[in-house]
């Protein structure tokens, strides 16, 4: 199916299920900035590949909201799809919430997958629909039903980081998190942010391109931690290390039902920007909830001596690769054909020579001549051009 056909299929489901407006954000179930292939739902339904944006569909309108980094790209990729670009922050452009409020009929229904909407955004949508006495249904992923060949969730294995890299044990990190919970007056902490779970457990993965993250959730109490993850990702040594810290392993999606069984006498700490709306709404009614930034955010920000030493070493290794690459460019430009893509490939080859290299941290931006004026330009076989001795060459890697 092409993009217009996909949108038509979505609208047919909207009609069948009683939705007047349906919203498709960029996020995964963990409110990640970048998402794995399984979660590229907004990209599938609009054709826009940028890392930020929200799509909204009505019975006869389709819109995509994105920021200034992607105006040019979105203009190009949305052409012929029937999706209108709404340039966020520009004069006269409504916000997503304002558009939804105006598009909903009295007593209508807004739909979205509550797993890919943060608590904070969910609250803003509740306020938006209230003016129309409308309802929210966050239980269905309609685009997922349209997407017949949707990639499965990543099954790539985890890997553990020793204290020679982390500088702190999981036991110590859990003790600090629990102390922060006490200060917040909470005895349960629900975490969905992938980087927070990975930091606490000293585990890493490859479930999101360019990021060492594992698809997982955590529920921490004062005496145990439940880790929700595909158990096949963990080897026996990892499981043993988790068990030493009274961390039990549970199926990845089981958290949604488990949360419903929390003791209503408990006080639950959640981050409204880093926990999804569906999970939040599964917390039993009457349970006291404290909404604040995950304590791990500040803990991760303050690097220990081991981390600082490793950061310095990593920069030195990358400096070696960059220096070799710039020398290669200067000595070979004009002698052999070097294109945007081949220059990027050469740099990665040189980085791979350095001990401990894993992968690049984002898709290389190698832009020659007029391509350098395109924000977040990424060369493709279709756009790749040769470098010239007199032109500008921009690199961000």
Give the residues covered by each predicted segment.
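ATP-grasp fold ATP-binding core
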Residues: 192, 366, 395
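A conserved beta-strand->loop->alpha-helix hinge within the catalytic CA
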Residues: 342
């Amino acid at each position: 199916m092409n993009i217009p056909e996909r949108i038509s299929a979505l609208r047919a489901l909207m009609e069948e299920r009683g939705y007047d407006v349906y919203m498709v954000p960029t996020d995964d179930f963990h409110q990640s900035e970048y998402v794995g292939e399984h979660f590229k739902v907004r990209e599938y339904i609009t054709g826009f590949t940028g890392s930020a944006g929200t799509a909204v569909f009505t019975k006869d309108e389709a819109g995509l909201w994105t920021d200034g980094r992607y105006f040019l790209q979105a203009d190009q990729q949305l052409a012929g799809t029937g999706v209108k670009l709404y340039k966020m922050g520009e004069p006269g452009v409504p916000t997503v919430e304002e558009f939804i409020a105006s598009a909903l009929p009295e007593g209508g229904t807004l739909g979205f997958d509550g797993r890919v909407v943060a608590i904070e955004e969910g609250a803003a949508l509740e306020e938006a629909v209230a003016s129309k006495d409308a309802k929210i249904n966050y239980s269905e992923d309609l685009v997922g039903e349209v997407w017949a060949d949707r990639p499965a969730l990543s099954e790539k294995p985890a890997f553990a980081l020793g204290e020679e890299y982390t500088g702190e044990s999981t036991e110590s990190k859990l003790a600090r998190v629990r102390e922060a919970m006490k200060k917040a007056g909470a005895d349960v902490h629900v975490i969905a942010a992938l980087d927070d779970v990975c930091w606490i457990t000293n585990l890493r993965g490859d479930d999101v391109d360019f990021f060492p993250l594992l698809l997982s959730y955590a529920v921490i109490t004062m005496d145990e931690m439940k880790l929700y993850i595909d158990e096949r990702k963990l080897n026996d040594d990892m499981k043993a290390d988790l068990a030493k810290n009274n961390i039990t392993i549970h199926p990845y999606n089981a958290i949604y039902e488990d949360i419903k069984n929390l003791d209503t006498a408990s006080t639950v700490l959640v981050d409204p920007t880093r926990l999804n709306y569906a999970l939040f709404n599964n917390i039993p009614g009457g349970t006291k909830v404290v909404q604040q930034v995950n304590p791990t955010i500040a803990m991760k920000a303050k690097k220990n001596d081991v981390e600082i030493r490793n950061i310095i070493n990593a920069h030195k290794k990358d400096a070696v690769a960059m220096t070799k690459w710039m020398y290669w460019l200067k000595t070979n430009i004009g002698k052999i054909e070097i294109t945007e893509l081949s220059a990027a490939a050469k740099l990665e080859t040189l980085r791979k020579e350095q001990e401990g290299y894993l992968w690049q941290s984002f898709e290389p931006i190698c832009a020659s001549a007029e391509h350098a004026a395109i924000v977040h330009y990424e060369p493709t076989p279709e756009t790749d051009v040769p470098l010239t001795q007199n032109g500008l060459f921009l690199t961000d890697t």
